[in-house]
């Protein structure tokens, strides 16, 4: 009996799941949290442990031996390889509407919030398109958009500013409304 208990304990220790935390591109409005949860449920051997909409950070749990095909315990994959695999799975399952980014580079209290009012964004796809213009810019740590057409970006002021955001939106032909 003691031998069986010992084997079970050792097995439980060796079957631990790995976790990693990432920023999520695609969380531009609150209902996208539900979309992400549903998509992650479809990923084999990947669980969403925690999701913080305010920071757009998500913690994923997975068994790296199942996540990485051809896993070799003598040469475990790099953190970058695991992140790339998770990103590929998420991007494919969401048809490209969710992707991973590294965690924010500056603390929240050092970010500057910039609000930009834009023209009609009456559908989720339109809001996503306008959001993506900002979310992909260097220095944008987080962005949101609402049905009223208010885009909000939390930026690293050392890397970007309002003019750069407005310029990118204009280039993408998003109508800016003057306050």
Specify the residue positions occupied by each region the protein language model found.
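Absolute protein N-terminus
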Residues: 1, 17-18
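Residue-level signal for functionally critical sites in structured catalytic/ligand-binding pockets
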Residues: 1-3, 170
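Sec-dependent N-terminal signal peptides
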Residues: 3-13
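Flexible metal-binding regulatory segments at protein termini and peripheral loops
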Residues: 18-179
């Amino acid at each position: 009996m003691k031998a069986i208990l010992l084997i079970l304990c050792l097995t439980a220790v060796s079957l631990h799941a790995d976790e990693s935390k990432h920023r999520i591109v695609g969380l531009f409005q609150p209902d996208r949290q539900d979309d992400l949860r549903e998509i992650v449920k479809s990923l084999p051997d990947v669980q969403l442990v925690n999701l913080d909409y305010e920071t757009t950070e998500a913690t994923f749990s997975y068994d790296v031996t199942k996540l990485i095909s051809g896993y070799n315990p003598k040469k475990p994959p790099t953190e970058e390889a695991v992140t790339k695999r998770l990103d590929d799975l998420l991007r494919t399952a969401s048809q490209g509407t969710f992707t991973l980014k590294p965690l924010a580079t500056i603390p929240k209290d050092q970010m500057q919030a910039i609000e930009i009012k834009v023209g009609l964004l009456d559908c989720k796809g339109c809001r996503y398109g306008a959001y993506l213009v900002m979310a992909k810019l260097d220095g944008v740590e987080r962005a949101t958009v609402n049905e009223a057409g208010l885009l909000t970006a939390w930026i690293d002021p050392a890397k970007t500013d309002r003019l750069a955001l407005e310029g990118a939106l204009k280039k993408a032909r998003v109508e800016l409304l003057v306050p």
